């Protein structure tokens, strides 16, 4: 009688099959985790923008508009109607926020990121009247929503 140690071929095949089944279940669950994190950063940037705009309004009685990119560059920026000044705001990396000045009582903004290819891929927020909402998904003033 020989004293063999080790696994048989059947035992190894069973382990490989079990690992394959676990991978087939786990990979789809975690595949879009990065996109979800980017969408969360877009919503976070919009919340921070609401706070920055309200602080700006407190000082100037006006809102600012413009396009802000996550690389720290403000590509375009517009004064409020009263020309009160410009908003200092930098979104997260690779996020682009376009703020549309409507009037001294409101504005709207949308946020996008090229890393998001699925849906939702755009988030928005508004301040002022509901007609300012960038999309029907944006239902509450000052509360970001994605579509």
Go through each PLM region and give its residues.
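Short, contiguous, well-ordered secondary-structure segments
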Residues: 1-2, 55
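N-terminal single-pass transmembrane signal-anchor helix
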Residues: 2-34
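Periplasmic/extracellular, small/polar-rich flexible segments of pilin-like filament-forming proteins
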Residues: 51-147
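Conserved catalytic core of two-component sensor histidine kinases
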Residues: 16, 43, 50
């Amino acid at each position: 009688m020989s004293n063999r140690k080790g696994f048989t071929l059947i035992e190894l095949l069973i382990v490989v099959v079990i690992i394959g089944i676990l991978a087939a279940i786990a990979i789809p669950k975690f595949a879009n985790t990065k996109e979800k994190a980017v969408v969360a950063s877009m919503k976070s940037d919009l919340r921070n923008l609401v706070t920055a705009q309200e602080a700006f309004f407190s000082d100037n009685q006006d809102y600012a508009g413009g396009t802000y990119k996550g690389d720290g560059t403000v590509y375009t920026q517009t004064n409020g109607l009263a020309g009160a000044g410009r908003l200092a705001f930098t979104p997260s990396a690779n996020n682009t926020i376009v703020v549309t000045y409507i009037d001294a009582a409101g504005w709207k903004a949308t946020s996008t990121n090229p890393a998001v290819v699925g849906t939702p891929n755009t988030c928005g927020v508004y301040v002022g009247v509901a007609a300012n909402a960038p999309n029907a998904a944006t239902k509450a003033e000052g509360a970001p929503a994605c579509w």
